[in-house]
C-alpha cells in the first residue's frame, strides 16, 4: 500500500521541524512547504525570512524530506493584512493569527498542498483533532486543546471548518514542549535552540507603533478620565488597547492613592472613535475595566452550527484560563454572560468557546458591558 502523502508547513522553527520528523517516523511520505507571506521590507533588520528558509531547508536535509517554498504574500495582504489595518483604523484590536490560520495556513496552504497530491496537511501547532466515531455526530471532526495546556493553540484555530480539520494532522498535540526541545536536541537539528517566534503573524517582531505608522492615518486627541477630566493627549487611538498600562505617558501623574500610599497606575479603559477620545482609569480593578457580558459577531463554529449547550466556558484572550459563562447565539452572532466579571474584554479580539477540551468555535468581540 502506498504511503499517505503529508505536506507539512515548515517555518524554520523547532515545532514544525520536530513535527516533520515525527510524521516520517510514523510512516508518512512527508513534503515540507515553506511559506513566504510578507515582502514589504525584505531587506529590513526585522525580516527573518531568509534565515527561516535556511533553517527549514537545513532541517529538511537532516530529517530526510523534500522541501519547497511557496509565496502567499499577495493572499496574505488581501485576506489578512488588509482586515488587520481596517480593524485598527476602526479603533479595535484585531488578532491577525486567527485570520492568518483560517485564510493562509489552512486555506491557501491546503489548496496548494492538494496540487502537490497531498492526502493530508500538517503544522506544528499545539492542538488535537478527533473524529467522532459513534452517535448522531459520527463522522464529525472535533478540535481539541493540546495535552500541553501551557502551549495550547486551539484559541487561534477556532475558525477552522470541518473540511479543513478533516485534512489536518497536529503531530504535537499529545506532546509537551519540553519533549519537543529534547527531540530536536537528540536529532541535532540545526535550529534546536532557536527561540519561538513572536510578533505579528508572518511579519514578526518589530516596534509596533513605528510599523503601524507606515500604513494608518492617525490623529492625536484628548485622554480623559470617566469624569470627563482631560489629563493628557493620545497619539492616535490605533496605538492603544484596552487594559494597556505601559506607554500611556502618564506615569508621573498622581491623583489616586492605594492604602499603602502608592499611586495606582493608569489603564486604557475605552476608545471613543466618534470623538477621538481615549478614556483612562486608575487601578487594575476599576469598574470600567470589568465586563459581565459581551456580544460577538463574525462567528465560526467548528461543527458548522452553533453549540446547543447554554453553559460553556470561554477565553477572551490567548493564555487566559477558561471562564464559566452562558451563551446565546442567533444568525447575527452570540452573547456571553460571565459567572464572574472579566477584565479588559477587548473589541476586535476573539471570544472562543469550549466544552471541556473541545473547542466549539467563536467570534469577534463587538461590545462588552460593565457589571450592573
Curated annotation (Swiss-Prot):
One BP annotation, GO: tRNA wobble position uridine thiolation
Q: Does the keyword Protein biosynthesis apply?
A: no
The subcellular location is:
Cytoplasm
> Which family is this sequence assigned to?
Belongs to the MnmA/TRMU family.
Q: Where is the signal peptide, in residue numbers? A: none
Q: Where is the active site?
A: 100 (nucleophile), 201 (cysteine persulfide intermediate)
Query: What UniProt keywords apply to this chain's record, in alphabetical order?
Result: ATP-binding, Cytoplasm, Disulfide bond, Nucleotide-binding, RNA-binding, Transferase, tRNA processing, tRNA-binding
Example GO molecular function: ATP binding
Query: Which InterPro entries does this one have?
Result: MnmA-like, MnmA-like_C, MnmA-like_central, MnmA-like_central_sf, Rossmann-like_a/b/a_fold
Any idea what this protein is called? tRNA-specific 2-thiouridylase MnmA
The ranges of region (Interaction with target base in tRNA) come to 95-97
Under Enzyme Commission nomenclature, its number is 2.8.1.13
Supply the Gene3D superfamilies for this chain. Answer: Adenine nucleotide alpha hydrolases-like domains, HUPs, Translation factors
Residues reported in the UniProt entry to bind ATP: 9-16, 35, 124
Positions of the record's site feature: Interaction with tRNA: 125, 349
Q: Which reaction does it catalyse?
A: S-sulfanyl-L-cysteinyl-[protein] + uridine(34) in tRNA + AH2 + ATP = 2-thiouridine(34) in tRNA + L-cysteinyl-[protein] + A + AMP + diphosphate + H(+)
Known function = Catalyzes the 2-thiolation of uridine at the wobble position (U34) of tRNA, leading to the formation of s(2)U34.
GO CC, alphabetical: cytoplasm
Tell me the enzyme class: transferase
- The cysteines joined by S-S bonds are 100-201
Q: What is the lineage of its organism?
A: Bacteria, Pseudomonadati, Pseudomonadota, Betaproteobacteria, Burkholderiales
Cite the residue spans of the region called Interaction with tRNA: 151-153, 317-318
Amino acid at each position: 500500500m502506498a504511503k499517505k502523502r503529508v505536506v507539512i508547513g515548515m517555518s524554520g522553527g523547532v515545532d514544525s521541524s520536530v513535527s516533520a520528523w515525527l510524521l516520517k517516523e510514523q510512516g508518512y511520505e512527508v513534503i515540507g512547504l515553506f511559506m513566504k507571506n510578507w515582502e514589504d521590507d525584505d531587506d529590513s533588520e526585522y525580516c527573518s525570512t531568509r534565515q527561516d528558509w535556511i533553517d527549514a531547508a537545513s532541517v529538511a536535509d537532516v530529517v530526510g524530506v523534500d522541501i519547497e517554498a511557496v509565496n502567499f504574500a499577495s493572499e496574505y495582504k488581501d485576506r489578512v493584512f488588509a482586515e488587520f489595518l481596517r480593524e485598527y483604523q476602526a479603533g479595535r484590536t484585531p488578532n491577525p493569527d486567527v485570520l492568518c490560520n483560517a485564510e493562509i495556513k489552512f486555506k491557501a496552504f491546503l489548496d496548494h498542498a492538494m496540487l502537490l497530491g497531498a492526502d493530508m496537511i500538517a503544522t506544528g501547532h499545539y492542538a488535537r483533532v478527533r473524529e467522532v466515531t459513534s452517535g448522531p455526530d459520527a463522522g464529525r471532526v472535533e478540535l481539541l486543546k493540546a495535552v500541553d495546556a501551557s502551549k495550547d493553540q486551539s484559541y487561534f484555530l477556532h475558525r477552522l471548518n470541518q473540511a479543513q480539520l478533516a485534512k489536518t494532522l497536529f503531530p504535537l498535540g499529545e506532546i509537551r514542549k519540553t519533549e519537543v526541545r529534547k527531540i530536536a536536541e537528540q536529532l541535532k537539528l540545526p535550529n534546536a535552540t532557536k527561540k519561538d517566534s513572536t510578533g505579528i503573524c508572518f511579519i514578526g517582531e518589530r516596534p509596533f507603533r513605528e510599523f503601524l505608522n507606515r500604513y494608518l492615518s492617525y490623529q492625536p486627541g484628548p485622554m480623559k478620565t470617566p469624569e470627563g477630566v482631560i489629563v493628557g493627549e493620545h497619539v492616535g487611538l490605533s496605538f492603544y488597547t484596552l487594559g494597556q498600562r505601559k506607554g500611556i505617558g502618564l506615569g508621573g501623574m498622581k491623583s489616586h492613592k492605594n492604602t499603602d500610599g502608592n499611586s495606582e497606575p493608569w489603564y486604557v479603559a475605552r476608545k471613543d472613535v466618534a470623538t477621538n477620545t481615549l478614556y483612562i482609569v486608575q487601578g487594575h480593578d476599576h469598574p470600567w475595566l470589568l465586563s459581565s457580558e459581551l456580544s460577538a459577531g463574525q462567528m465560526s463554529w467548528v461543527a458548522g452550527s452553533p453549540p446547543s449547550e447554554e453553559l460553556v466556558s470561554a477565553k477572551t484572550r490567548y493564555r487566559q484560563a477558561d471562564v464559566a459563562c452562558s451563551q446565546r447565539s442567533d444568525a447575527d452572532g452570540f452573547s456571553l454572560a460571565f459567572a464572574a466579571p472579566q477584565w479588559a474584554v477587548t473589541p476586535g479580539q476573539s471570544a472562543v468557546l469550549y466544552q471541556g477540551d473541545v473547542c466549539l468555535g467563536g467570534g469577534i468581540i463587538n461590545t462588552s458591558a460593565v457589571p450592573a
